[in-house]
Amino acid sequence: MIRYAEFCTGIGGFTLGIARSELDAEMVYCNEIDDSCEKTYEVNFSRKFDSKDIFGIEADKLPDFDMMCAGFPCQPFSQAGKGLGFSDSRGTVLFKLVEIIKAKRPAIVFFENVPNLVRHNKGDTYQFLIDSLNENGYSVFDKILDSSYFGVPQSRPRVYIVAFKKSVFGDHKMVFTDKKTKQTGLRNFLNYGDYSIPISEKWEEYIDLYTKKKSINDISFELPKTRRSLERIAPNCDLNDCIFQIRSSGIRAYSLDDPFPTFAVSNSGGGAMIPVLSKERRHLNLTEMKRIMGFPEEFVFPVSRTDSIKQLANAVCPPVIESICNDLNAIAKGILT
């Protein structure tokens, strides 16, 4: 059995994906500083975090583990965020993770982050991670995978990094299953029978204008300057039967037959980018947002709606983790198990 430790655990995207996979694995440690995430994690997995700040962890006091997992904070490296990298305290979590790797020398390192991590600071940030792993005896493999090819109705590209300790795996290479099946559209994942969350009244007139006019040009000067940046993504999109994403810069429209773009929270507040169904004039409900992220309907959120949405938007996508762990199982079976 593979013993694994999870850092920056969030609400358990890694935990859930690993549990669903063929990998014979047991969690021996998990860490997360967010109290709200801990409540959600505990009620779903009957387990408490080590909730101390990751920078306060003494690596030599951690239990031994074969695999280290982390979906470390993406905001410092994200194009949607400020991209401050190591100037953001959350970005320096990467240094701590490398420190733990050096101390514990797990056989497998498994990380997830935004694709922009690879390009951040002209590639220097990512090169630091690769060099650190190489210098400590690891072979590093990575792949950008989009969740919409894994049965999730959301286009959520992420870079997945797997490193093998050479002294354990020798010349074995990680092969990611890159599923190029049809992307998953959103329409069949909507839950029309569930409760509805009305949109804010201040947006009603904007949505009305948007659906009554034929083109963006027809309405661009009818909206305030801060809402003029309108983008109709799908050329065949029916504005009376689509999904809107209300952003600080304006409104974007997407076809329900396509995957929804990356679900995220705004830097200015938890609900600013919650998707809106044009036909029903409502936000997506929590059941639908769980489906967008690949979480099961029975997954419980014992926290406020705002916190629930934020937790989902920051989560790791379990179906992709499950697929990668199945790939890992094919290699690790007979070596670690």
Predicted regions and their residues:
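Conserved proline-anchored active-site loop of SAM-dependent methyltransferases
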Residues: 4-13, 18, 54, 64-81, ...
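A short, Lys/Arg-enriched amphipathic alpha-helix followed by its capping loop at the start of a domain
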Residues: 17-26, 44
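The conserved SAM/SAH-binding core of class I Rossmann-like methyltransferase domains
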Residues: 31
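Conserved SAM/SAH-binding beta-strand->alpha-helix loop
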Residues: 34
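Conserved SAM-binding loop
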Residues: 41
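Conserved SAM-binding strand-loop segment of SAM-dependent methyltransferases
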Residues: 47-53
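Class I S-adenosyl-L-methionine
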Residues: 57-67, 77-255
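C-terminal target-recognition/interaction regions appended to catalytic cores
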Residues: 210-337
